[in-house]
Amino acid sequence: MQKHDTKGFKVGDNIRIVEMVGEPHYNGKVGVIESIDDMGQLHGSWGGLAVHADEDKIERV
């Protein structure tokens, strides 16, 4: 199974979405990473869409 790069982010980290590709209304949202799926997508309290650590711009807060 291929390991996907989560850029060091882990469950429990507080993050801010700086830029989510194709979803500008998520930019600036803050939340906690609640799970990471098998594809390396980050799911959390910022809303219904997953963050892709290798595509979207996020930062720890």
PLM feature segments, named:
Residues 6, 10-61:
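Basic/aromatic-rich interaction segments and small domains that mediate binding to polyanionic partners
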